[in-house]
Amino acid sequence: MSLLRSLRLCLVARTGSCPLSALGPGPLLPSLQAGLPLLQSPQQWHTFHSGSWLSSASSKELLMKLRRKTGYSFINCKKALETCGGDLKQAESWLHKQAQKEGWSKAARLHGRKTKEGLIGLLQEGDTTVLVEVNCETDFVSRNLKFQQLVQQVALGTLLHCQNLKDQLSTYSKGFLNSSELSELPAGPEREGSLKDQLALAIGKLGENMILKRAAWVKVPAGFYVGSYVHGAMHSPSLHNLVLGKYGALVICETSELKANLADLGRRLGQHVVGMAPLSVGSLDDEPGGEAETKMLSQPYLLDPSITLGQYVQPHGVSVVDFVRFECGEGEDAADAE
């Protein structure tokens, strides 16, 4: 075959058609004699290989909807829809299961790495208040929205756990959950599995070791009030009454009547607990100095050191009965020293 004829045949292969006369003399392939292109167009090839469910606008909308809802990549969302025959609910479940597998695998590889950073989360609803701590490796990840959503899920899980405790209160109740207990709590009505499954998902997405460190909860009846404070506070983007930060405190007060300024008073008491780190409440009769320096009521008041906290509280007609203080990452330095 001549060079010119070969080049003409290549031209046919690229364009899909050409006048038969342009090929010059000589025998032609049967497909060319019938006037058919040698190759299908690129668009036809793409449609054939992409799966029939992607050929309609509604299917592409499904892909976009799954992407927006889950946050996973287009490639993974497309694979999920293909695997599940275009069923959106099944595709979402499939994605979460795959991500969980990857997360558990990554968690096993990262286990043991130090988690000194993270966030404290404080959530109040009705007569219930919870304080949680979730740790990660770097401050950079603690500022990531996905990590903050994990803290939110842990706070909500703890709140639901506390609200499900059917006890008749004559006084306040307070409880703590360690890492293991916290991990086993249900993830919530809109989430599958437990909080440890949500932890695995977050580890898979963010690539750092993380732990659900601890939680505290307080329930109060009438006649009690819980003051709260979070240092460096920022509000959750999707849950207005969840506050995030590096330090958090709850202060339980008993009061004979509901006062208009209780919220401000509770915040100031929480600030004192965060700043002065008392170890116990103490009493109004404690003398300042010595061991009393660790007792809340005999400590110099944080915002006015000329008086004790007890002297500040007394005119307001409330009694401080208990408190909880969380500092993000506390205990890690001591563990390193050991």
Curated annotation (Swiss-Prot):
Residues 1-55 form a transit peptide. GO terms for cellular component: mitochondrial matrix. Pfam families: EF-Ts_N, EF_TS. The keyword Phosphoprotein applies. The keyword Disulfide bond does not apply. The modification N6-succinyllysine is found at residues 89, 146, 205. Keywords: Elongation factor, Mitochondrion, Phosphoprotein, Protein biosynthesis, Transit peptide. InterPro entries: EF-Ts_dimer_sf (IPR036402), Transl_elong_EFTs/EF1B (IPR001816), Transl_elong_EFTs/EF1B_dimer (IPR014039), Transl_elong_Ts_CS (IPR018101), UBA-like_sf (IPR009060). Its main location: mitochondrion. One of its GO terms (molecular function) is translation elongation factor activity. One of its GO terms (biological process) is mitochondrial translational elongation. HAMAP family: EF_Ts (MF_00050). Associates with the EF-Tu.GDP complex and induces the exchange of GDP to GTP. It remains bound to the aminoacyl-tRNA.EF-Tu.GTP complex up to the GTP hydrolysis stage on the ribosome. This is Elongation factor Ts, mitochondrial. The lineage of its organism: Eukaryota, Metazoa, Chordata, Craniata, Vertebrata.
